[in-house]
């Protein structure tokens, strides 16, 4: 069989139920439930040791399943040998055969096809991954990006019913990784490929995935589309992993806070005359409906964008969030009943200490001196309730 795309018309896809993988006393995968629909690309995202690769390897049959079920189209795969599962595998280093040319590498899994059909499939795969005419190239002459494209072509050539990719781009530099992530997404969509993809890189995950699953300590914390995951991280663990600042029950995505006006009397920057500075943006009722004060702790330049680490009052931030239209504690409580009293007065009445100043990151157009007082605005579109 030499289809140009994976046949997903009658498939129900991958089902993982209560999956556990153990290494001695270590529970690397701890009761994970996961569904991957036919034609869907699900990316598992997590730090090193989160269990994402162990989960993928268990699905592939490369790790023993301590508990739970792995099924394809409703049929258990737990006792099915690796080579009979019909799954394709691609790893970080590509694992190309250096003694074979590019065409022979891609044709490796096509031994059941006549020679002419093998050649046609190899050419088709090279076109798909953007390397037409590379059949006779020596593997040792390929760049890192070209080698990973060939590895992807080899994995796709037999039209696997499920493609498993374990950190396929992590050995490449960031610029190439960003380009290839976009290309991989296009290639998988074009072929209608069902895929489970593992990475520690958030940008890569958000580019490639239909849905992203965040893992920590062997557990799947959250699984959703990239858009909804950013809009509703769901927990402080997920929010922090995604790079959000967490202040109380608010998750602030990068860019949620911005410096919009320098307070009077801020020390001038080196080379400036005088001790006051101009506002970063005009503060008018139309452009600045609600703000809160903060103190700059440090400034840094990251990827061409100035950031200010600031100290602010979490209760003032919560009030600003409500002013900006985010649901307040009462609304978040919903049908579960009224929210517990909050605020300084409620804290004192309950014997709790009032909320202390906390740190967050704000975007700014220029560096600010440590100790400078600034005014911040909040972007509701980059802010979520937890």
Please report, for each region that a protein language model flagged, where it lies by residue.
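A short, proline-enriched helix->beta-strand linker immediately N-terminal to the Walker B motif
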Residues: 157-161
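Conserved ABC ATPase signature
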Residues: 138-142, 146-148
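Short coil-to-helix segment of the ABC ATPase nucleotide-binding domain corresponding to the Q-loop/switch region
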Residues: 100-107
